Amino acid sequence: MSHSVKIYDTCIGCTQCVRACPTDVLEMVPWGGCKAAQIASAPRTEDCVGCKRCESACPTDFLSVRVYLGAETTRSMGLAY
């Protein structure tokens, strides 16, 4: 089953999510929006097993990385904050 991995611009570039991912779905890419000058990216979402370890590892108050599982993807993405 395919999962959707969304990286938000609240990412602080700490690499915690990248290190927590057991299937190497995430990687860091250059980005000028934070002091670390990098942001998480999810180029291999087809390898995501939906364990959400990346979410658990994220130290930001608003989770900067979110994994949406199957049917949850379309339902959750439509919510307004």
UniProtKB/Swiss-Prot annotation:
Origin superkingdom: Eukaryota
GO terms classed as biological process: photosynthetic electron transport in photosystem I
Topology in the lipid bilayer: Peripheral membrane protein
Entries under InterPro entries matching the protein: 4Fe4S_Fe-S-bd, 4Fe4S_Fe_S_CS, PSI_iron-sulfur_center, PSI_PsaC
Predominant subcellular localization, coarse grouping: plastid
Swiss-Prot/TrEMBL keywords: 4Fe-4S, Chloroplast, Electron transport, Iron, Iron-sulfur, Membrane, Metal-binding, Oxidoreductase, Photosynthesis, Photosystem I, Plastid, Repeat, Thylakoid, Transport
Annotated ranges, domain 4Fe-4S ferredoxin-type: 2-31, 39-68
Enzyme's top EC category: oxidoreductase
A GO MF term: oxidoreductase activity
Pfam families: Fer4_7
Residue positions binding [4Fe-4S] cluster 2: 21, 48, 51, 54
Cofactor detail note: Binds 2 [4Fe-4S] clusters. Cluster 2 is most probably the spectroscopically characterized electron acceptor FA and cluster 1 is most probably FB.
Positions with a binding annotation for [4Fe-4S] cluster 1: 11, 14, 17, 58
Coiled coil: none
Classification via HAMAP family: PSI_PsaC
Cited function: Apoprotein for the two 4Fe-4S centers FA and FB of photosystem I (PSI); essential for photochemical activity. FB is the terminal electron acceptor of PSI, donating electrons to ferredoxin. The C-terminus interacts with PsaA/B/D and helps assemble the protein into the PSI complex. Required for binding of PsaD and PsaE to PSI. PSI is a plastocyanin/cytochrome c6-ferredoxin oxidoreductase, converting photonic excitation into a charge separation, which transfers an electron from the donor P700 chlorophyll pair to the spectroscopically characterized acceptors A0, A1, FX, FA and FB in turn.
Protein name (record): Photosystem I iron-sulfur center
Organism in which the protein naturally occurs: Nephroselmis olivacea (Green alga)
Upper lineage: Eukaryota, Viridiplantae, Chlorophyta, Nephroselmidophyceae, Nephroselmidales
